[in-house]
């Protein structure tokens, strides 16, 4: 690739958590591939996590770099997720913006304190929201609903003012939607950040949720650029393996195991980087997977232990006795602990289905790989994503969880092994319904790939934002 001459300078300021950090790094790389000078604002702790892929991009001539802010956020604090206070980065950010004055800064929604300093310096600020058009529309239309007609948390209600007939329950909603009058200050801060922004970058693509993309673009007071799936910037095996952080599993062992399986024969199960399932839920998943008699690869991340228990993932009684040995002997299953190269796994020819927590990154990665899903939402906007997958796109089946899980709270809503087995069989065993889900999933995957190519809708939106920033620069200079 020849060296690109930068057209505009854009700063990308990701949040420290993996689920928010990874897609914004991908977005920065995507904009760099369009000729925008992209600078990623990182901390001493986060810079090493993506230094290798940025160095590779630089060798290919892309105008991309990392600026490490002088302050840091302690890694031990990242476990509190979206509630982590990152305002220690405010002064280093202010000094950098005074020195460099980029044409635009893309800010993660969780840096809710950043709005004032960017606004004060007159730099256009674009919000990176991290969820899709459908979920944004659901949230916006539920934000001012009092739910007066609902008598219990389990009673269904119709989501108003959206193109599809979608029912939800109070138990599937985060607290700030259940009780809009009691919105915490942090959520109000994020809403204010959105309202004062120049526009919003959305990691999705038009053909995935066209009615909702149109709704956002026509009704939002600010501008929206739909630029995904940004994960397509990861072309090489190295990019996919090292995305986010180095895998903590034996990558080659994982790929060798998958290579030994027939095409379209394996279920991939993973619940993301932050979800912490308790041992009793892990056991039910294990029993359900075994009873389904389907081949699977299961990545177990963090475990929600009682305070008195050993907290090492490799210890404790969190799998049925003899389970892993039986899976090894029969060749039916592979259990992995820690961080796995999800893009590589999902794109492998052996993968037939994906059991997922419906985080937006995982949802888009499953969509892009053309893999139908078993949906197991836990928190955030994941129940809305489940509705998109199973009721709008019709490319998945629900496992049956009905309880929204408050962050770091006691686990609720245990899903039994029978429901796990039924969902796995429904997705993995050949049937007219399963075949139709796979056909739709493959069709959508093709549209995802075309969206980021020249002539695609996401490609056009990236170009449109760059051109708008160029026009603003010319107007200011004139």
From Swiss-Prot:
EC number annotated for this UniProt entry: 2.4.1.263
Top-level taxon of the source organism: Eukaryota
Binding site for an anthocyanidin: 20, 380
PROSITE patterns to which the protein is assigned, alphabetical: UDPGT
Active site: 20 (proton acceptor), 108 (charge relay)
Swiss-Prot/TrEMBL keywords: Glycosyltransferase, Transferase
Binding site for UDP-alpha-D-glucose: 340, 342, 357, 360-362, 365, 381-382
Family: Belongs to the UDP-glycosyltransferase family.
Record PANTHER family: GLYCOSYLTRANSFERASE (PTHR48047:SF81)
Identification of the protein by name: Abscisate beta-glucosyltransferase
Natural source organism: Phaseolus angularis (Azuki bean)
